[in-house]
Amino acid sequence: MSTIRPVFYVSDGTGITAETIGHSLLTQFSGFTFVTERMVFIDDAEKARDASQRILAASERYRVRPIVVNSCVNPYLSVILAESGALMLDVFAPFIGLLEHELNTSRHSRVGRAHGMVDFETYHRRINAMNFALAHDDGVAASYDEAEVVLVAVSRAGKTPTCIYLALHYGIRAANYPLIDEDLNSDQLPLRLRPYRKKLFGLTINPERLQQIRQERRPNSRYAALDTCKREVAAAERMFSAERITTLSTTHTSIEEISSKVLVTLGLQREMF
């Protein structure tokens, strides 16, 4: 059996739902090379037939049955896609019938509900949170009064991506503060952070992994040297311990997991967008 499998994320909208669920499923299987392709805005029969032909062509090219992760809400489009002979994984079908029975009503299919601008107020909050994260990145803001969380870590430990994820997916006003040499000379929190102790969450990282990341940014620099990374990480961890700041290692932790831990630790109740 071939270890190369073509995978198509097919959607009548942005494809975010299909790709997110599909990626989560595929990561459960090792030993395979998944060649993925996104097919988005497949919202009529003509587009569905074209997609089906492309999937069929992949079957012939790779000589193996493709996998289709489908989030199209129109069942007719799903039927057309199935003509490709691919393994069809419909992300809604297993649950819609159960929910219709439980709620005693039929679904109202609408493209883009999962990630569209269905609720303007919610969408506006998300955009504001994103702008906040960008304006409060890397300690550039003078105050964290409006922040709901302030991530603290040495440079390149995952602060910015996590803040952006919290903003986009939860509407959280997330700021971050980079620990510099001046801060790391003491086991006490920097003066700027002390008024916001209850909002702080520390990120740490394996020095070897940090060195790899920094090497990509500034090759062969003092900034990327392993001894620099070891010194900074050790100093940051001493500070977090002394100040009793909750921490999490980002070395083998996804942004999704980091964000969930932050929300739980700080008691931030917010539905995912």
Curated annotation (Swiss-Prot):
Transmembrane intervals: none
Catalyzed reactions: [pyruvate, water dikinase] + ADP = [pyruvate, water dikinase]-phosphate + AMP + H(+); [pyruvate, water dikinase]-phosphate + phosphate + H(+) = [pyruvate, water dikinase] + diphosphate
An example Pfam family from this entry, by short name, is: Kinase-PPPase
State the Gene Ontology terms under molecular function.
ADP binding; ATP binding; phosphotransferase activity, phosphate group as acceptor; protein serine/threonine kinase activity
**EC class:** transferase
What UniProt keywords are attached to this protein's entry? Kinase, Nucleotide-binding, Serine/threonine-protein kinase, Transferase
Positions annotated to bind ADP: 153-160
Q: What is its EC number?
A: 2.7.11.33, 2.7.4.28
What family name appears in the similarity comment?
Belongs to the pyruvate, phosphate/water dikinase regulatory protein family. PSRP subfamily.
Give the protein's function: Bifunctional serine/threonine kinase and phosphorylase involved in the regulation of the phosphoenolpyruvate synthase (PEPS) by catalyzing its phosphorylation/dephosphorylation.
- PANTHER family attached to this UniProt entry: PYRUVATE, PHOSPHATE DIKINASE REGULATORY PROTEIN 1, CHLOROPLASTIC
What name is this protein filed under? Answer: Putative phosphoenolpyruvate synthase regulatory protein
